[in-house]
Amino acid sequence: MHGLRLVCSIGTLPLVILAYPAASLHTTSAAVDLDSLRLTSNSEYVNSVHVDTNRSVAVSAEEHYTDTAARLVQNIVPGASFRLIDDHFVGDNGVAHVYFRQTLHGIDIDNADFNVNIGKDGLVLSFGHSFFTGALPSSHLDNTNVLSPEAALRGARDAIQLPLTIDNVSTEAAEGRNEYIFREAVGAVSDPKAKLVYLVKPEGTLALTWRIETDMYEHWLLTYIDAETTTVHGVVDYVADATYQVYPWGTNDPAEGHRTIVTDPWDLSASAYTWISDGRDNYTTTRGNNAIAHWNPTGGGSYLYNLRPSDPNLNFQWPYSPNMSPPRSYINASIVQLFYTANAYHDLLYTLGFTESAGNFQWNNSAHGGRDKDYVILNAQDGSGFSNANFATPPDGIPGRMRMYIWIESTPSRDGSFDAGIVIHEYTHGVSNRLTGGSHNAGCLSALESGGMGEGWGDFMATAIRIKPNDTRTTSYTMGAWADNDKCGVRDYPYSTSFTENPLNYTSVNTMNGVHAIGTVWATMLYEVLWNLIDKYGKNDGSRPVFRNGVPTDGKYLMMKLVVDGMALQPCNPNFVQARDAILDADIVLTGGKNRCEIWRGFAKRGLGQGAAHSSLNWMRRGSTLLPTGC
C-alpha cells in the first residue's frame, strides 16, 4: 500500500515525510486510486435542539424504542419502504440507537440509512438519514439485461484491476435474496460475495448494482458495479489505513520512557476473562478474548498457527532495545507490546461505552449483546509493507485485522508495535467504523470528509492518551515521530492550540483531497475542546476514568467519552458540522449540556462555530468563529 506524502510544517522547516497509508492501492492488490471511487455523502443530521423546536418530528413514546424510531422514519419519509437492522442497542448513557435501511422492490438501497437516537425519556433525541426521496424506478429484476453475478465479479475484477483468478470459480446461492458466494477464486483471503442492491448515485438517481465483496487482505473492498453496464459507481474499503515486560500505558514510544514489568494489567470489569482466556479456553500465549497477536513475516492471511510467544508460567518477558537488529531478533517483545497496547485500549474503550452491544471486538460476548467471534487479529512485523499500519473493520461478528509494519526511516529500523500512538490510531478505526451508522454497517465512513474524520479520531485518541501530568494547553504533540525517525511526525502540523504551530481551520478542508490531511483538521478541533474541558475540570493522569453518576470527573476522559458517544449519535457518513452537533448532543445527554460553551469555543476557534456550513452542491465549506447566545 502506498503512503501519502505530507509536508511537515513545524516552525519554518518544510520537510517531505511518509505518512500512514493512503487510499491508493498497493501494486500487489490493485492498480487504481480508491479515493476517486469513494461514495459521496448525502446525510443530514437533526440535532437535539432542532428536534425540540420542530413539531413536525414530534413522536410520542411507543412501548418499545424501536417502534418510536420506526414511527419517526414514517413521519419524515412518508411512503418509504425500509427494514430494521438488528444491531440496535442502548448505550451506557441511556440513549438507544436504532438503525434502518431503505428498501425498494425488496432490495436494499445500500447507502440509504436512517439512524434514530432515543433518549432516556423514550422520546426522539436526534436523528440522521440519507434516505432517497427522488423518483423511484420500476423493478429491474425481470430485465434480461441484468448481469449475472459471475459477470459482475469479472467486471469488478477488471475495473479495479484486482489480482484475482476466477477461471474455475463456482457460484453458490447464499442465504439472502439475490446473494451469492464464489468458490475457488484464487488470490482472495476469503470467498468473494455478490449481492444485488440499489445505490444512490452522486447526481441523485438510483442505480441497480451488484455489490461485489473481495477481501484482498491489503484492501477489503465492496465494489458497486452497475448491474447492466459494468460501470463502477463506487467503492468502500473496510481497511483504513500474567506479567508483561512492556512500555506501560501512557508511554507512547521508547523515546518517552522505559520498559517495565506489569502484573495482571487487565480491568476485570471490561475483560472478565482476563486477556489470556476467552471463557472456554485458557492460553499461555498472546491470545485471549479481545485479541490474538503473532508474527506475520509473509504478510499472508493465515494467522492461527503463526508464531506467538508462549510461557507456561505466564511471564511474557523478552529482551528489547531500540538498538537491536534485525527485527526478527526481538519479535517476541514486539508481539507482547502489541498485544498489551491493544488489550489496554480495549479495556479503556469498554469503560467509555464501546461494549459488546455497541459492536466491540471480542471472541465471546457472554450474552451481553452484539455479535461475537470477532477479536482483533494483530499482525506484528507484517511482511506485506513498510513504514505504515492499517486496520480492517468488517461488520460486527467478523474479526478486525491490524497490520503493524517495520519502519525503515532509521538505522536500525523501528518496529511500529512499539509506537502506541500508531496502535491506538489504527484500533480507533475499528471503533469509529463500528459506532457510526451501526455495527452492522461498516461503510459509514467511506466518503472523503467522513473518512478524514476517521483519521482524525484516531489521532485525537492517541494524543489524549499520551498527555503527561505536567502538560498544559501550550503542549503540542506530533504523530508517529519515533517510528518515522522525524521530530515532525507524519502529519502536516503538530496537534497544538497555537495558531503559530498549527494554523488549520475549517475552511482549510476546501483545498484538501486526502483523508489524512482532512483528519488533521478534525483532530486539531478536538484537541482545542479537550483543553477547554481540562481547564474546567482538571486532568486525571490515571489509566482509567473516574466516574460520578456516569460522568468522567476530569476533562480528558470526559472529552474522550463525548467523542465515543458522539460517534454513536451521528449519521452515516457525517460531515464536520454534523459530527460537531453529535458531540454537543452527547454532552446534553451525559451532563445536561453543562459544557456547551466549552465545546462551542473549541470548535469556533478553528472556524466551526455557529453558522459554519457545508454545501452539498459544490462541497465547499463556509467557516464561522461565532458563538451561540449565552457563550
Swiss-Prot record:
Zn(2+) binds at residues 425, 429. Glycans are attached at residues 282, 332, 364, 470, 505. It holds the Pfam family Peptidase_M36. PROSITE patterns: ZINC_PROTEASE. The keyword Cell cycle does not apply. One of its GO terms (biological process) is proteolysis. The active site is at 426. Residues 20-241 form a propeptide. It comes from the Eukaryota. GO terms for molecular function: metalloendopeptidase activity; zinc ion binding. GO terms for cellular component: extracellular region. Residues 1-19 form the signal peptide. Its EC number is 3.4.24.-. Gene3D superfamilies: 3.10.170.10, Neutral Protease Domain 2. Its cofactor is Zn(2+). Binds 1 zinc ion per subunit. This is Extracellular metalloproteinase mep. The keyword Zinc applies. The lineage of its organism: Eukaryota, Fungi, Dikarya, Ascomycota, Pezizomycotina. Belongs to the peptidase M36 family. It is found in: Secreted. Keywords: Glycoprotein, Hydrolase, Metal-binding, Metalloprotease, Protease, Secreted, Signal, Zinc, Zymogen. It comes from Aspergillus niger (strain ATCC MYA-4892 / CBS 513.88 / FGSC A1513). Secreted metalloproteinase that allows assimilation of proteinaceous substrates.
